[in-house]
Amino acid sequence: MKHRHLQFIAVLFLTMISACSTSPEKEYYIFTSFHEPANEGLRYLYSEDGYHWDSIPGIFLKPAIGKQQLMRDPSIVKGPGDIYHLVWTTSWKGDLGFGHAQSKDLINWSEQQMIHAMSDTTTVNVWAPEIFYDDVDEQYIIVWASCVPGKFDRGIEDEDNNHRLYYLTTRDFETFSETKLFLDPGFSVIDAVIVKRNPEDYVLVLKDNTRPNRNLKIAFSQSPVGSFSEASEAFTGEFSEGPTVTKVGEEYFIYYDMYREKIYGAMKTSDFINFEDITNEVSIPNGHKHGTITRVSASIIEGLKNQSAK
């Protein structure tokens, strides 16, 4: 009887050890960032609760491509094989593409790659590429804003500030689809973020870049590449840009750059129709400029902190 009792305890102990070893690793939110004038490189913020953010000191990727060698609007996503892909704006004007690099630990990065995006040589700019992994078609979708003078009704905007959204796709960052028009909402538009809520249920957060609006709106679609519904009324005040969306609990947080006030704003929503301003409930370090939020393991954060301390 005693022997059986010891056997039972041993089995119970091993079961507990096995359960502990297979429990999921703790996750954190990480926010890609840059500081003006955007020539230093990639920075990170991190958060445990999605509300309160701390910086991880240091530069983790210095820009080395493009006419101006900038790193603005860093957008990141994790794809198959636990590989993180980063895209960014390389110049204010003059480049016909955007930057790309990949990493498994957010510290050691591949050689930087200029992805050619626009074939029309009159294109003024390629701004704010946003990367999204489409798990249905198993491909990456990159959306950005460009001005092509004379191509669209400019309204009150100048030809060099009359943006529309374009996109391309890739599975391997070696072969790319042709560039296509992503969205022409009838006004100058930049800073588009795709959010998947459910199968055949996608949300697009975008910036109406016309004067005096300069604010954020919403559109809906059954596909990540549209077609999209007519853009909603604005859900932020004027001079808002660079949105990023993350899910905290059962609600979505939309962080955005209130660039005239030089602070970060945040909205909370469960349906992308009704919004609650939670700007006073969140904390963002000074100097942070807009990137994107994703979730990473505790070991990734630990590695970044260790690298920062060197």
Segments predicted by a language model, with ranges:
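Bacterial Sec-dependent N-terminal signal peptides
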Residues: 1-25
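Carbohydrate-active catalytic/glycan-binding domains of CAZyme proteins
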Residues: 20-310
